[in-house]
Swiss-Prot record:
Protein's name according to its UniProt entry: Ribonuclease PH
The protein's Enzyme Commission number: 2.7.7.56
Source organism superkingdom: Bacteria
Reactions listed under catalytic activity: tRNA(n+1) + phosphate = tRNA(n) + a ribonucleoside 5'-diphosphate
Alphabetized GO MF terms: 3'-5'-RNA exonuclease activity; tRNA binding; tRNA nucleotidyltransferase activity
Keywords: Nucleotidyltransferase, RNA-binding, rRNA processing, Transferase, tRNA processing, tRNA-binding
Annotated residues for binding of phosphate: R86, G124, T125, R126
Job description of the protein: Phosphorolytic 3'-5' exoribonuclease that plays an important role in tRNA 3'-end maturation. Removes nucleotide residues following the 3'-CCA terminus of tRNAs; can also add nucleotides to the ends of RNA molecules by using nucleoside diphosphates as substrates, but this may not be physiologically important. Probably plays a role in initiation of 16S rRNA degradation (leading to ribosome degradation) during starvation.
Pfam families assigned to the protein according to its UniProt record, in alphabetical order: RNase_PH (PF01138), RNase_PH_C (PF03725)
Protein family membership: Belongs to the RNase PH family.
Length: 245
């Protein structure tokens, strides 16, 4: 039994609140245990200069954490005048993952801005951001469809992410909270599509190594969790699912 009472291969309690914000074309508040992230999707009727005239769209992301999302207050990165390497890495990860399942040609020459703001952090903020951002993005695409600006919702598949790890006294566990993540021997983030294709796998031994057999076990656990997350995304999207499948 884990510190929060879960089984080893069990997700935290997940809730996806859709249309959480008034102004964005798509928005959600995703809760993964005590981790809470607001994800919004904004449609801009233009593309970056490097893509003009190509007839394709673009998806990009920004990620931030409010000062007291963590146990101790952290200084806003805007106060420092630059984003940290960690933030830049996460932003690129979110954008890259979403682009893997977006039909950029069907989107047309538009930019989708994804904003992920962590309001409470307890591990897995980047994976929660990806899972929530996908739903926010599809909600925004539904607005484009209703306005007859696109002929279909421009996504090719579902997308979700979770963490897995090896914690000494537990072995392989799914969806690590902060307490588990901080003492894990191996920490891994996995992003997959609804068809079971991998988009990204980030795995690191923390002063430890892991075997091929353990890697397979980690990926199996991640796959199980991600398919459950995708079912929750479908439930959150409701009737919009009929435009995707």
């Amino acid at each position: 039994m884990r510190v929060d009472g879960r089984e080893k291969i069990e997700l935290r309690h997940i809730h996806i609140h859709t249309n959480y914000l008034k102004h964005p074309e798509g928005s959600v508040l995703i809760e993964v245990g005590d981790t809470k992230v607001i994800c919004s999707a904004t449609i801009e009727e233009r593309v970056p200069p490097f893509m003009r005239g190509e007839g394709k769209g673009w998806v990009t992301a920004e990620y931030a954490m409010i000062p007291r999302a963590t146990e101790q207050r952290t200084i806003r990165e805007s106060s420092k005048g630059k984003v940290t390497g960690r933030t830049m890495e996460i932003q690129r990860l979110i954008g890259r993952a979403l682009r893997a399942v977006v039909d950029l040609e069907a989107l047309g020459e538009r930019t989708v801005w994804i904003d992920c703001d962590v309001i409470q952090a307890d591990g897995g903020t980047r994976t929660a951001s990806i899972t929530g951002a996908y739903v926010a993005m599809v909600l925004a695409f539904e607005k484009l469809l209703q306005a007859e600006k696109v002929s279909k919702i421009p996504v090719k598949d579902y997308l979700a992410a979770t963490s897995v790890g090896i914690v000494e006294e537990q072995g392989v566990v799914l969806d690590l909270n902060y307490a588990e993540d901080s003492k894990a021997d191996v920490d891994m983030n996995v992003i997959m599509t609804g068809k079971g294709q991998f988009v990204e796998v980030q795995g690191t031994g923390e002063e430890a190594t892991f075997s091929r057999a353990q890697l397979n076990e980690l990926l199996d656990a991640a796959e199980q969790g991600i398919f459950q997350l995708i079912d929750m995304q479908k439930e959150a999207l409701g009737d919009i699912v009929s435009h995707i499948e």
